[in-house]
Design a protein with these regions (language model features):
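Short aromatic-enriched loop/helix-cap "lid" or pocket-rim segments at secondary-structure transitions
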Residues: 63-67, 170-175, 225-229, 268-271
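Positively charged n-region of N-terminal signal peptides that target proteins for export
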Residues: 1-4
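N-terminal carbohydrate-binding accessory modules
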Residues: 20-115
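Bacterial N-terminal signal peptides
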Residues: 7-16
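Gram-negative outer-membrane beta-barrel proteins
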Residues: 61, 128-130, 224, 266
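Structural recognition of the beta-strand scaffold that forms the well-ordered cores
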Residues: 49-59, 116-122, 126, 159-161, ...
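Extracellular glycoside hydrolase catalytic/binding regions
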Residues: 32, 186, 192-213, 217-309
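An active-site-proximal structural segment forming one wall of the substrate-binding cleft
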Residues: 28, 33-34, 89-121, 126-128, ...
Length: 309
């Protein structure tokens, strides 16, 4: 499933371009986005309808976004670079890549187009001492997010943090940098690491209202694991509840976003939507007409849960 999510939930409106006071002295936003029934509500009481885009391929390199035909996941891309130019030059490339792929000017442009939110996919290894993007210790995940937070504050954009590549892999494809199976859903060690990293992230950003919320994982469980689908789906909601509980130990303010199984499209794996008062669901739609009927199952699930989708 090799696609780019350029917009999620709502398309850009280019006819309503905002102006920004911005600046480091800005006190925007006044408070946290929260869930209120099927809506997201800002601190001023106004509903928030997400308009935005996705910073894919920055902190989670993906081969198809580079235009590679055979090298697809982060570790394979790094292996290719090391074979071509050696580990030192590969590390130098990644350092410059992270500095230049997304910049303040990009965030400024996105805001000028009428967006109100950006989604930041990231690899869990950015919060470990694993070999990733040229570093084997002192990973810079927090430093990178801190910078995006300040850019978003300056240009009045909310930020969704999306763990696109989870320990063990949640999808079983190239997009999660896994070993070809969603081991996260069967490995206790991976699940504990997953929860620990989210708790560390939540502890750091618990008082940061620029962050709209924490998207626990991207597109869990690829469709082709049919033989294990019941097992994998059955393990998904308990893990999401466990991770949410870990977050709530340190952060009770931010929204937690839960994606459905099978590329964020199947929501029959969820049976309890009352375990937390500030959760929402997130769906991905590939193809189809831009009509309510094309996303009827998502609308029905939203109405059933009375939570934002």
């Amino acid at each position: 499933m090799k696609r780019i999510l350029f917009a999620f939930l709502v398309a850009f409106s280019i006819f309503s371009l905002p102006t920004f006071a911005g600046g480091k002295g800005s006190h925007w936003p006044a408070g946290y986005v929260r869930v209120d029934g099927p809506n997201l509500v800002q601190a001023n009481g106004e509903k928030l309808l997400i308009r935005g885009t996705n910073f894919g391929n920055w902190l989670n390199p993906e081969g198809y976004m580079f235009g590679f035909k055979k090298v697809n996941s982060p570790r394979f891309i790094n292996e290719m670079l090391c074979q071509l130019v050696g580990p030192d030059e590969a590390a130098a490339f990644w350092a410059e890549y992270k500095d230049k792929y997304i910049t303040r000017e990009d965030v400024k442009f996105i805001a000028s187009c009428g967006a109100n939110t950006v989604r930041l996919p990231f690899h869990y290894a950015l919060f470990t001492d694993e070999d990733f993007m040229g570093l084997t210790a002192n990973q810079d995940g927090f430093a990178r997010i801190d910078q995006v937070v300040e850019w978003c504050r300056e240009f009045h954009l909310y930020l969704i943090l999306d763990m696109h590549d989870c320990p063990g892999g949640q999808t079983g494809d190239n997009i999660d940098d896994s070993y070809g199976y969603p081991w996260l859903l069967t490995s206790e060690a991976s699940q504990q690491q997953f929860c620990n990293i989210w708790q560390r992230i939540a502890k750091r950003y618990k008082n940061e209202p620029v962050i709209l919320g924490y998207e626990l994982m991207n597109e869990p469980i690829a469709h082709y694991f049919e033989a294990d689908m019941a097992l994998l789906k059955g393990n998904l909601e308990p893990l999401m509840k466990r991770a949410t509980a870990a977050i709530r130990q340190v952060d009770k303010k931010h929204v937690v976003l839960l994606g459905g199984a099978v590329w964020n499209s199947h929501f029959d794996c969820f049976s309890d939507w009352t375990f937390d008062s500030n959760i929402m669901y997130t769906c991905h739609r590939y193809g189809g007409e831009p009509t309510p009927d094309a996303i009827r199952s998502y609308i029905d699930f939203r109405d059933k849960t009375n939570l934002p989708m």
